[in-house]
C-alpha cells in the first residue's frame, strides 16, 4: 500500500465515480483537482496547440506550438513573442514536437528540438508533405532573444506509404530529455514500420523477400524506429550505450544506428521522464485498442511490440481485443483494423506467452520485462513528469504525473502514480492493481484507475514538468494553455 489507506481509497472511488454519469452531457469545463488543498491556475492561454515546454528561468519559458512550428517565449504569464518559426508538417502526429535544454544551457545556450520538416518550405498538413527522413533533431543556440540554428543532430523516418493502406503520419514520438548523465534521450515511434526493431525477425513477409523498410540499407533508417536513442550532445553514440559493441561488430549505417539505441520494441510514446531521486528513466507507451503501458526503462530494454503489449501473461487478452471485429475501425473503408497495419495483422499475435517471447528479436544484451503498470483497454496516456519539490506538500514529492493523449477520459485525465521505496515499481493503494494491470471495462474508461485520478478536464495533456518555483505545470494541447498546480491560497 502507498501513503493512503485502503479506507481512504474506498472514499476516493466514491468521490470520482459520482460525476461519471454526467460527463458526456456536461459542456467543456476548466481543469479541476480532487485534492481541495490544491488549485489550478492558468500560466498562459491563447496558444495554438502547445505541446511541450522548457523553463529558461523563473517565470520564463519556451513553449512549442505543434502545427504553427513556432517557439514562443512566455514571461510572467504573457506571450512575449516568437523566438523561432520552423516550416513544419503537422499532419496527424507530426509537427514541432519536443524540446530539451542542454545541461549547460546557461553557458552555451544550446536548445534541442524534435520536429517534422515540411517538404514544401512552408507549414503544411498533408500526409505526403514530408521527405522520407523528415523527422529530425536539431540544435539551436539561444542568444537571449531568439533561437538560431546551430547543427543537425539526427534524422528519422517520417514518410509512411505502404501498399494496400492509406498514407499515415502517426507514431513519430518526439519527446526529448537530457538525463542526469548529461546524455540526450529521444523517443522515436515505430512510424508504422514492421521489422526487427518491432520484433519481427524477418519482417512481415517472411524470409527471402528484400525490403529496405525492414532494417536497411540506407537511406531508409527503419532500424531507428520504435526506439529510445541515447546520444552525446553532438548526436554521436556514447560508448557505454547498451548495444555499442554490437553495433560496432555489425558495422555500416545499420551498426551505427544500433550503437545509438538505449531501448527498442516501442510502439509509440508521448511521455518520458527521469526520476529525480533514482535517476531511472520512465516512459509511457500507447497501445492500439489495448494495454497502454508505464515502463521503467533499463538500458537495453526490449519493450515487446509488436509481439506483446502489456504483461506477457496477458497476450491472449491482447490478441482477443485487437482481433475483435466490433472494435473501433478507423480505416474501415480500406478494409482493415487492429494494429494499424495490414502487413502484420493482429491475427498473427501469439496465443501463449511462451510463443510470444520466443518470437522476439533479441539484440545481444537486450532484455524484456513486463511494464510496471498497464491498462487492459486503451486510456491513451500522454505526457509524464515527476514533481521534484515539496511545493504541493510532502505527500506529492517525487510522484509521477501522467496526462492524457486524448480527452475522452474525464475530459482529459491527470493521473498521480506513486513509486515504491526503492523507486523500482509502482506503489498502489487499490488492491485490484496489485497485479500491475488496471482491468477497465472499455476504452477511455476509469475502472480500477479511480485511485490514480488526480485531476480532470485538462484536455490533451502533452507535457508535465516541475517549474523553477517548484509548482507542477501541465501543457494542454487541446485547450491552448499551460496550467500551473500549487497549494490553494
Feature map (PLM): residue ranges:
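Bacterial N-terminal signal peptides that target proteins for export
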Residues: 2-13
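Intrinsically disordered, low-complexity regions enriched in polar/acidic and amide residues
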Residues: 3, 28, 339-340
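Sec/Tat signal peptide C-region and signal peptidase I cleavage site
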Residues: 22-28
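Beta-propeller domain segments
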Residues: 33-34, 94-96, 104, 117-119, ...
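Short, Gly/Ser/Thr-enriched beta-strand-loop segments that form substrate-interacting elements
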Residues: 452-457
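Bacterial N-terminal signal peptides
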Residues: 11-21
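Acidic, Gly/Ser/Thr-rich repeat motifs that build Ca2+-stabilized beta-propeller blades
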Residues: 28-196, 200, 271-274, 279-290, ...
Amino acid at each position: 500500500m502507498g501513503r493512503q489507506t485502503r479506507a481512504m481509497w474506498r472514499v476516493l472511488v466514491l468521490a470520482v465515480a459520482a460525476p461519471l454519469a454526467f460527463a458526456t452531457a456536461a459542456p467543456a469545463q476548466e481543469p479541476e483537482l480532487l485534492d481541495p488543498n490544491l488549485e489550478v491556475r492558468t500560466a498562459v492561454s491563447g496558444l495554438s496547440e502547445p505541446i511541450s515546454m522548457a523553463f529558461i528561468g523563473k517565470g520564463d519559458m519556451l513553449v512549442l506550438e505543434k502545427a504553427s512550428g513556432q517557439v514562443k517565449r512566455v514571461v510572467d504569464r504573457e506571450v512575449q513573442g516568437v523566438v523561432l518559426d520552423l516550416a513544419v508538417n503537422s499532419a496527424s502526429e507530426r509537427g514541432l514536437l519536443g524540446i530539451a535544454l542542454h545541461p549547460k544551457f546557461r553557458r552555451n545556450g544550446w536548445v534541442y528540438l524534435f520536429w517534422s520538416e515540411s517538404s514544401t518550405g512552408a507549414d503544411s498538413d498533408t500526409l505526403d508533405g514530408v521527405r522520407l527522413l523528415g523527422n529530425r533533431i536539431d540544435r539551436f543556440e539561444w542568444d537571449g532573444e531568439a533561437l538560431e540554428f546551430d547543427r543537425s543532430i539526427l534524422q528519422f523516418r517520417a514518410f509512411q506509404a505502404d501498399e494496400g493502406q492509406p498514407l499515415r503520419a502517426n507514431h513519430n514520438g518526439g519527446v526529448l530529455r537530457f538525463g542526469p548523465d548529461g546524455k540526450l534521450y529521444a523517443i522515436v515511434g515505430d512510424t508504422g514500420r514492421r521489422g526487427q526493431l518491432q520484433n519481427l525477425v524477418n519482417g512481415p513477409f517472411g524470409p527471402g523477400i528484400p525490403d529496405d523498410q525492414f532494417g536497411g540499407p540506407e537511406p531508409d533508417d527503419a532500424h531507428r524506429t520504435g526506439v529510445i536513442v541515447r546520444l552525446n550532445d553532438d548526436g554521436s553514440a556514447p560508448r557505454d550505450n547498451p548495444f555499442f559493441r554490437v553495433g560496432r561488430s555489425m558495422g555500416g549505417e545499420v551498426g551505427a544506428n544500433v550503437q545509438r539505441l538505449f531501448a527498442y520494441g516501442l510502439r509509440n510514446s508521448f511521455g518520458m521522464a527521469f526520476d529525480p531521486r533514482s535517476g531511472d528513466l520512465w516512459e509511457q507507451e500507447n497501445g492500439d485498442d489495448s494495454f497502454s503501458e508505464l515502463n521503467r526503462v533499463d538500458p537495453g530494454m526490449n519493450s515487446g511490440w509488436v509481439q506483446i503489449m502489456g504483461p506477457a501473461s496477458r497476450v491472449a487478452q491482447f490478441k482477443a481485443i485487437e482481433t475483435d471485429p466490433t472494435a473501433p475501425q478507423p480505416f474501415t473503408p480500406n478494409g482493415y483494423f487492429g494494429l494499424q497495419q495490414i502487413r502484420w495483422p493482429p491475427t498473427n499475435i501469439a496465443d501463449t506467452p511462451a510463443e510470444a517471447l520466443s518470437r522476439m528479436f533479441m539484440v545481444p544484451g537486450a532484455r524484456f520485462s513486463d511494464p510496471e503498470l498497464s491498462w487492459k483497454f486503451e486510456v491513451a496516456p500522454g505526457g509524464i513528469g515527476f514533481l521534484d519539490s515539496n511545493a504541493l506538500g510532502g505527500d506529492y514529492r517525487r510522484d509521477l504525473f501522467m496526462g492524457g493523449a486524448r480527452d475522452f477520459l474525464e475530459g482529459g485525465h491527470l493521473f498521480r502514480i506513486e513509486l515504491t521505496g526503492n523507486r523500482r515499481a509502482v506503489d498502489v493503494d487499490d488492491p485490484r492493481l496489485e497485479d500491475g494491470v488496471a482491468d477497465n471495462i472499455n476504452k477511455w474508461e476509469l475502472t480500477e484507475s479511480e485511485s490514480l485520478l488526480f485531476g480532470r478536464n485538462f484536455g490533451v495533456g502533452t507535457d508535465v514538468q516541475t517549474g523553477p518555483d517548484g509548482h507542477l505545470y501541465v501543457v494542454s494541447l487541446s485547450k491552448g494553455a499551460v496550467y500551473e498546480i500549487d497549494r490553494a491560497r
